């Protein structure tokens, strides 16, 4: 696997050892037209899920990839030789309920209160500098002057907390991050790093 490099400050070493990463790769990609997780952008060394996993591996002791039924087999094969990567899919009774389904499935690996660094495959250009900034703060999410980015976040949560939120019938990840996790915004300048691959136009602009 191609690796990316980053210098991790000494004062982050404890967080690196105690934090789990979650890569959200289970979206249906309806607007995009094909599975965003497996798309490889021109000039990038890996596909989008590979980029996300590699970045989180630099900051987390274990990375959990939340897949869907369609890409589960391919992603499992992609990370078959990665000892610190686990691929999971939605669990009953919360299948196909958006990002929170993926977060619920991922928290099954460590159900107790745990630090998680979240990154969706929608953000292939996000930098490790941005992620490192989030790691230095607890319960936070990235925001820019024009948009909030709840799937680029660092939260402390448990499977019980995710379950309780889902049982309320509220599937908005924004409410989960801000209300259940009491996440606060960390503001970054607008930049290409926050390009969200929601459609083919975004893919063209990211090239």
Where are these regions (language model features)?
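Nucleotide and nucleotide-moiety/phosphate-recognizing core
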Residues: 17-150, 157-159, 164-170, 180-194, ...
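Short, Lys/Arg-enriched N-terminal segments with co-localized hydrophobic residues
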Residues: 6-18
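Extreme N-terminal basic, low-complexity initiation segments
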Residues: 2-4
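Short amphipathic alpha-helices within nucleic acid-binding modules
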Residues: 203-206
